[in-house]
Amino acid sequence: MGRRAKMVEKVKTLMETHEQIRNMGICAHIDHGKTTLSDNLLAGAGMISKELAGDQLALDFDEEEAARGITIYAANVSMVHEYSGKEYLINLIDTPGHVDFGGDVTRAMRAIDGAVVVCCAVEGVMPQTETVLRQALKEKVKPVLFINKVDRLINELKLTPEELQGRFMKIIAEVNKLIEKMAPEEFKKEWLCDVANGKVAFGSAYNNWAISVPYMQRSGISFKDIIDYCEQENQKELAEKAPLHEVVLDMSIKHLPNPLTAQKYRIPNIWKGDAESTIGKSMVACDPNGPLAGVVTKIIVDKHAGAISACRLFSGRIKQGDDLYLVGSKQKARAQQVSIFMGAERVQVPSISAGNICALTGLREATAGETVCSPSEILEPGFESLSHTSEPVITVAIEAKNTKDLPKLIEILRQIAREDNTVRVEINEETGEHLISGMGELHIEVITNTKIGRDGGIEVDVGEPIVVYRETIMGTSPEIEGKSPNKHNKLYMIAEPMEESVYAAYVEGKLHDEDYKKKTTADGEARLVEAGLEKDQAKKVMSIYNGNMIVNMTRGIVQLDEARELIIEGFKEGVRNGPLAAEKVQGVKIRLVDATFHEDAIHRGPAQIIPAVRFGVRDAVAQAKPVLLEPMQSVYINTPQDYMGDGMKEINNRRGQILDMEQEGDMSIIKSSVPVAEMFGFAGAIRGATQGRCLWSVEFSGFERVPNELQPKIAKQIRDRKGLKSE
């Protein structure tokens, strides 16, 4: 039996022992060394050859990733590691660090209980470090820290042992400051990265060595020894004395929780059902014999097997051939194959139990974030939806070059939307174009070139990228009458800005899109009040949609309950297109204050009520001082001081705002905010301005009001592009 086959047998055995399972992820800012670290962990565990680790990038098994040298999708792998005489099963997920692929990070966080946050010793804490940490802590995923590229501090920056320790302490202090700010209240102190007890490791993933304070005490290696090894270019010997996989995996097993421990505090955070129900108790206890409950965290498309769903099980067990139920899409499915992940391969197993991550085939209609349960015991409600820190900010129109490819193109686009819920796919009914919205230029490029072109074999024409704008209101409208086409039904409403704290809660994922069937649920009401909505209104919310809400403030109108679903549909249609440029509306609260209906139900059907509400909402928004909002990005530039002026000039030329500047040695760090509309071609321009000597990164930072003097011009450009008549 080969080494790999033995590993599979061990994995099958360990899957049943919760205390010896760790579901963990590796996350970081782009190019801080996540995938190199993952590969060396795999090599140490005997999954790939040691000679190739570091260059092989086993988890970058997509051609596009290997070509770009960055991780685009989150890859999964199971492996075994021995610690203190016991074997442990490690389910490892390597996540992308590039801001355009943040959706994969969000989805991976739902599957794992602990994370190794990788931070480059040279660059320190960067924007994406903060973002991935925020996402981890929001999902109650416990972090430990690995400071990578330490050899560069010694060989390139020539730091002394004292300076080395100073640099480490600065990075650790910054990470701990973020943990204290963002961790759940009960873990703010407990989850801090403490060097002394081994929650921090230092090393070089590329050169395959790592060290932690407990390991230094055990092995007798000091910082001075490390400097000597690096200066003498003898890092191979250092890797034998302090192997990376041993130090990092020991740290992970000791400090990251097993599923039994983690699910006790994670389940109440991601599932808002009855904690005292059988399934509620079973999930908290991670019971393999309880009712089935799991969540799909990723969809991978395999040329031979079709759609494969990566799934984290919180309760129960899945066997091959089991009937399943998908809560979100309300569909039944069957588990055709049950497997574990081994990088690009999947190994079939007879069954998978609670606390593990598995691969399922047969879930055709599943999307990322879907709740999986048994048809005989349906999980109500499903798991909380996955909320992302970024939103799609760029749209392109695509058309198949050959019309016979159209049906296939539509199928691929459907598949992409299922795989990646940060992508929006729409069909422009008038032009027949398909519109794809994504997180940035690279995200869109990977979808059009790789997913459609390379994998789908379809040649497409891709239009110029278009920025996604939003509309909101600055004032309150008068009372507006919405009248049905037959003039027999009238609804009266007022549009006003949503409370800032309520909208902020929506953006943070504490509130989400929801229709309330009769009245606000008790849980929904409590969340709304906590977010800052008046109790009187919180009871009467009819629907929250795309960051807008409608509240029923009428009294004693009998027919209103019958028309409730139609009113909600009319409200949704009303906020899909704003009055200025037919862009989506956000941050608007519609108060329904009165209504009169025809007594005969036949005269108050969908064709009457939906248009009445839709026109009423649009009119109310149009009379409440509407304004355009544009997406913004935080831009961080790290450049030698000689080029600081050029870097600042580049930001200022793009309507940017310098927010902060820091000096570190002979480097300057510029923090700024720039509209996405001005960021096209930035990569080439900033490299030119600093002669290629800068590091830079961007991150979505929300929507801001377009300056007054540009509002009419941008609104006209959007209207012209959409073929709408000019206002």
Swiss-Prot record:
Residue numbers bearing the Diphthamide modification: H603
SUPFAM superfamilies from the UniProt entry: EF-G C-terminal domain-like, P-loop containing nucleoside triphosphate hydrolases, Ribosomal protein S5 domain 2-like, Translation proteins
Predominant subcellular localization, coarse grouping: cytoplasm
Domain tr-type G: 19-260
Cited Pfam families: EF-G_D2, EFG_C, EFG_III, EFG_IV, GTP_EFTU
Gene3D superfamilies assigned: 3.30.230.10, 3.30.70.240, Elongation Factor G (Translational Gtpase), domain 3, P-loop containing nucleotide triphosphate hydrolases, Translation factors
Residues annotated for GTP binding in this entry: 28-35, 94-98, 148-151
UniProt keyword annotations, A-Z: Cytoplasm, Elongation factor, GTP-binding, Nucleotide-binding, Protein biosynthesis
GO molecular function: GTP binding; GTPase activity; translation elongation factor activity
Location of this chain's protein in the cell: Cytoplasm
Signal peptide interval: none
GO CC field: cytosol; ribonucleoprotein complex
Membership in a protein family: Belongs to the TRAFAC class translation factor GTPase superfamily. Classic translation factor GTPase family. EF-G/EF-2 subfamily.
Function, as annotated: Catalyzes the GTP-dependent ribosomal translocation step during translation elongation. During this step, the ribosome changes from the pre-translocational (PRE) to the post-translocational (POST) state as the newly formed A-site-bound peptidyl-tRNA and P-site-bound deacylated tRNA move to the P and E sites, respectively. Catalyzes the coordinated movement of the two tRNA molecules, the mRNA and conformational changes in the ribosome.
Protein name per the record: Elongation factor 2
Gene behind the chain: fusA
